[in-house]
Amino acid sequence: MTRIIVVTSGKGGVGKTTSSAALATGFAKKGKKTVVIDFDIGLRNLDLIMGCERRVVYDFINVINGEAILNQALIKDKRTEGLFILPASQTRNKNALTKSGIDRVFTQLVNMNFDIIICDSPAGIESGAVLAIYFSDEAIVITNPEVSSVRDSDRILGIIASTSQRSSQNFKPIKEHLLLTRYNPKRVSNGDMLSTEDVLDILRIPLIGVIPEDTSVLKASNQGTPVILNYNSNAGQAYYDTVNRLLGINCPFRFVKDEKKSFLRRLFRR
């Protein structure tokens, strides 16, 4: 059974595309045939983070418009077996995405035996975001531990509940997951950032992962490499933990405590 997962947020700049690339790579590393689709029409970025921008010949809109077949537009990742990228178009016409066109593409992907379809959604409520949500079975809501980001995520949860295909057909609701990015335990301890508990108290959806603030994320993006492939980075390890949880594997949350304060507490207990 193919899982269609939208990666979304209420605002831009929270690490949506970085997370889409990392999670898709992680699923493929786990043996799942995976495709990650860029729904951000006109602002194509996924191909840059995946390092395949020079290999784009046809795109999502070309397939929807019948100007190319799906196999011509799918880009096979050179580093990870079983991983494919479907890039967005650079067109400024946001209306180029249609329900019927997306439905045809998704039907073909299911028939091609893809296990996972990751939809990299644009931020907010533009048409690409709403359509990505409409077709999905699960939603990963990305937020930073900041009040404005969390507030915008609360709004997107309302959209998920009301606009999905599942809600319109009275099916079981979209399964919602929270992914907290750019988390800095030291800043949380200093009162400069919301804690995981604060965010969960506001959004009230299950926490699937906590990605720490890590310079390796920017470095990986600039190199066109999903950060999950940097096995020595904290962010890469946290994304692997997130993939495991999405596959039903229990693992503890790491990188959520201020290690300096934890060390001092242990020291004074002796």
UniProtKB/Swiss-Prot annotation:
Query: Has the keyword ATP-binding been applied to this entry?
Result: yes
**Record GO biological process:** division septum assembly; negative regulation of cell division
What is the protein's given name?
A: Septum site-determining protein MinD
Instruction: Look up keyword Membrane and say if it applies.
Output: yes
Please give the Pfam families that the UniProt record associates with this protein.
CbiA (PF01656)
The membrane topology of this protein is:
Peripheral membrane protein
> Source gene?
minD
Q: Which coarse location class applies to the principal site listed for this UniProt protein?
A: membrane
Report the source organism. Answer: Buchnera aphidicola subsp. Baizongia pistaciae (strain Bp)
Task of the protein:
ATPase required for the correct placement of the division site. Cell division inhibitors MinC and MinD act in concert to form an inhibitor capable of blocking formation of the polar Z ring septums. Rapidly oscillates between the poles of the cell to destabilize FtsZ filaments that have formed before they mature into polar Z rings.
